[in-house]
């Protein structure tokens, strides 16, 4: 099974889960907490692009959060 590639941006999933993708790194916000995850665990549809501020802070957040 081929794994889908995701373009940079924000994805909305079921149950209020939001995914943030930048340069193939993925953050998931679930119940108010951020986690690192992989493209195998994105269950959402592309909603809109990341803002410039989000892009600037992405790596800082990514490096601090736990793996899902």
What are the roles of these predicted feature ranges?
Residues 67-68:
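Short acidic DE-rich linear segments
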Residues 2-7:
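Negatively charged, low-complexity tracts enriched in Asp/Glu with abundant Ser/Thr
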Residues 11-59:
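Acidic, low-complexity, intrinsically disordered interaction modules
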């Amino acid at each position: 099974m081929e794994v889908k590639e995701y373009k940079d941006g924000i994805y909305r999933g079921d149950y209020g889960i939001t995914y943030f993708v930048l340069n193939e790194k993925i953050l998931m916000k679930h119940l108010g907490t951020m986690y690192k995850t992989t493209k195998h665990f994105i269950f959402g549809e592309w909603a809109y692009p990341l803002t410039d501020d989000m892009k600037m802070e992405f790596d800082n957040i990514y490096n601090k959060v736990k793996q899902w």
